[in-house]
Amino acid sequence: MKFVEEVVVEEFLPTFRSLLAADLRERGLTQQAVADVLGVSQSAVSKYATGDVAQNELVAEDERVRDLVERVGEGLASGDMSRVQALVETEVLIRRLEAPGDVFARLHEADVPELAAYEGDFRVHDPESELLARERVRSSVGRGVRALEHAGGFATLVPNV
């Protein structure tokens, strides 16, 4: 069982941070200044700079990710954007990338093939999703069947057809 949030942590964050660190360095910030802006250690920025942190190609090549990196990099470097705004802008993009069929949904389906087998659209966080309703019904039917299997004498009531 792997949560979509794990996809964000394992695939998006290292990729996004390394792209943003590179953007900020290109704008003239020192490694320490980049570390301060990103809220990470200077050592982490050094790893981003030397390519020691793997990037997810699907995330790195997404135009929306690239646009956000450029916008946030420019805003943070110039002081026109606060760290809070950068965080919120990034969170908004993360939610968009979780949409059915989008980047995180595809990565999540690759890690949890059972999700790919489901033919409808769904949002993992939607408490009213069709997928969740279907899985709850499946579980309920399973509990009912198990209860019937263990009910004494029930088998004699079922006709042989």
Which residue stretches match the model-derived regions?
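Short, amphipathic alpha-helical "recognition" segments used to contact nucleic acids or chromatin
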Residues: 13-28
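Short, solvent-exposed alpha-helical "recognition" segments
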Residues: 15, 48-63
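Key DNA-contacting residues within the recognition helix of helix-turn-helix
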Residues: 42, 46-47
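DNA major-groove recognition helix of helix-turn-helix
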Residues: 25, 38, 49
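Helix-turn-helix/homeodomain-like alpha-helical modules used for DNA recognition
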Residues: 70-160
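Short, basic, alpha-helical segments at the C-terminal edge of helix-turn-helix-like DNA-binding modules
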Residues: 62-71
